[in-house]
Amino acid sequence: MAKNLKITLHHGIVNRTPAQRATVKTLGLNKIGKTVVREDTPANRGLVNAVRHLVTVEEVD
């Protein structure tokens, strides 16, 4: 069974770099408190790592 990542945006993107804003948008997050579930792939891990100070991540099945 494939693992998934539950990603929640906990900090806003105001006053963040354009790259960080684009990364948050790519993950499908647009409001504080919004949660998305994404497949656990190296690409998604890299996106999360780039904005790790703005999001929380949980592994789910």
Curated annotation (Swiss-Prot):
GO biological process, one term: translation
InterPro entries for this protein: Ribo_uL30_ferredoxin-like_sf, Ribosomal_uL30_bac-type, Ribosomal_uL30_ferredoxin-like
UniProt keyword annotations, A-Z: Ribonucleoprotein, Ribosomal protein
GO MF term (any one): structural constituent of ribosome
Membrane spanning residue stretches: none
This protein's record includes keyword tRNA-binding: no
Entry's Gene Ontology cellular component terms: cytosolic large ribosomal subunit
Assembly: Part of the 50S ribosomal subunit.
Assigned protein family: Belongs to the universal ribosomal protein uL30 family.
Full protein name: Large ribosomal subunit protein uL30
Species of provenance: Bifidobacterium longum (strain NCC 2705)
